[in-house]
Amino acid sequence: MLSPRYILPLHDELVIDLFAGGGGASCGIEQAIGRSVDVAINHDPEAIGLHQANHPQTRHYCADVFEVDPVAVTHGRPVGLLWASPDCKHFSKAKGGKPASKKIRSLAWIVVQWAKAVQPRIICLENVEEFQTWGPLGPDGRPCPQRKGQTFRQWVGSLRNLGYEVECKELRACDFGAPTIRRRLFVVARCDGQPIQWPAPTHGDPRRLETKARGLIPWRSAAECIDWTLPTPSIFERARPLADATLRRIARGIVKYVIEARQPFLVSL
């Protein structure tokens, strides 16, 4: 069901999904505005194939985002919403110590290119929180600590110089009804003179008293979204044995969430 609080009045404006992947963001946008995105762009044929299967009404471009001309794509129609979720692995703390790719770290500049070319009324970018540390790489191919965040500030400044009001917030989807506690950065830019409005949390930590006091719904768990009746091979039946580190993590999880938990996590099969 659509919440009137979140419906964007896009009228006849186009909705564009850059870095569309298999369509996760497009599905969320469709739930929010009540229709499919108009254009989806991604370089991966398999991802675009999956997106086409789930969003047949959408116009698809299987290409590098920098090779797609915004003016040619939009055919003179106004763009109401441009959504971008560029590759995050070269910013994420989960990446480890491997050198970063300068090309991948520069993907977000495509947003500025679209802003210059067709001036979308609203721009949204989603990424890991470390995206705010975007800066130049040193000679060793790793981010330069002394210039942390420099490129990110330049990127935001470029949008503001084009007439956009820009705001950034770190949000967790679990506070809005999705079963994940991961924190993500959301950047919203508008050039229509209207204020940027952020949603108020609808869900909260069930262990905290303020969740009930504020009338919030308890966080959902991933277990609620899994059909446990589906036959699935056991992780312990793999041909390749599990690594010792993996086994230790499993053991720690059993201790924490089953043996020592106030409410042990158990699934009836």
Regions found by a protein language model. Give the residues of each.
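Class I S-adenosyl-L-methionine
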Residues: V68-L81, C88-R238, L266
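Short, well-ordered alpha-helices that flank and scaffold nucleotide-derived cofactor binding pockets
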Residues: C27-Q31, A53, Q113-K116, G157, ...
